[in-house]
């Protein structure tokens, strides 16, 4: 599975990243003595870096199994149901580090096996 990430896609994925980073930064700024909040903020930064790749990997995998027609239904494209898109983006943000790590291991194993 090849990732084709364009500049437009990266810029589009910056919007949710900036929102989540801002929320975490404001929480950390108010309570800088809390070590857990500092580590959560560092984890948030790492997830922000891997988020666009994670979202693309998940989209490619889901489209492979369900087909493109499934994602073009009114349930997913209706602007009123935009909360579903927000939930999907938050899900991708939370699991971005493990997804990218698994993808990199998969690519490395594939390259080492010579296929």
Curated annotation (Swiss-Prot):
Query: Which Pfam families does this entry report, sorted A to Z?
Result: Microcin
Can you provide one Gene Ontology molecular function annotated for this UniProt record? toxic substance binding
> What keywords appear on the UniProt entry?
Bacteriocin immunity, Cell membrane, Membrane, Plasmid, Transmembrane, Transmembrane helix
Q: Does the keyword Protease apply?
A: no
Report the GO terms under cellular component.
plasma membrane
InterPro entries hit by this protein: Microcin (IPR003061)
Query: What is the membrane topology here?
Result: Multi-pass membrane protein
Where found?
Cell membrane
Query: Where does the chain cross the membrane?
Result: 7-27, 38-58, 87-107
- Function recorded in the entry: This protein is able to protect a cell, which harbors the plasmid IncI1 ColIb-P9 encoding colicin Ib, against colicin Ib.
Name recorded for this polypeptide: Colicin-Ib immunity protein
